[in-house]
Amino acid sequence: ADPGRSGSSCTMLETMIQVLPMRENEVLEQFARVLGRRMAAGSGAVLDEVSEGTYLVGLTLEETAKKYIDRGAAISIVYPREGTSAVADGCAVIRGAEHEENAKLFVDFIVSPDVQRLAVEKLYRRTVRDDITPDQKEEGSIMDFDLGWAVKNQKSILEKWAALMAGNGGGS
């Protein structure tokens, strides 16, 4: 999907740039070439198009792929040997909030063993707890994703990507 419209696709592009031993422009140019300058209509369409045979490979979220597999889709997950990112979803309590104690209780609730077990078993998410074992072995090495770098460089990366996908090159 278009990383200019999909946060997960943007993170995947930034992950490739960070983990692959090539210059940024080389990563972008090679990936655009491999895609044939075509992208799925949206993140949700990636697995549909792979399942239907429109594409042989798709980049998507682990949890989404696991849901498709459990629903019977004839696909499998392959993790990049270079590693992949796992950008945390956030939850925080705003200091001085009107209902600060309730907010703290909510955070305690969502990181509790019962909710984290539910997240693993029913939502296909990785737990934030060390004392909960995932249903299946979690595969793929997790790289140290530099979120600060990604935020700082996102606009430039997306501009280069859009130019490449339009056939105008990506700059240097």
Positions of PLM-derived features:
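An extracytoplasmic/periplasmic, membrane-proximal ligand-sensing/linker region
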Residues: 127-172
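Extracytoplasmic ligand-binding site segments that recognize negatively charged/polar headgroups
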Residues: 1-54
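A ligand-binding cleft/hinge motif common to bilobed small-molecule-binding domains
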Residues: 51, 55-74
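Short, hydrophobic alpha-helical packing/hinge segments within bilobed ligand-binding/sensory domains
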Residues: 46-47, 64-65, 103
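Substrate/cofactor-recognition hotspot
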Residues: 106
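Periplasmic-binding protein-like
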Residues: 1-5, 28-33, 39-40, 71-95, 109-132, 139
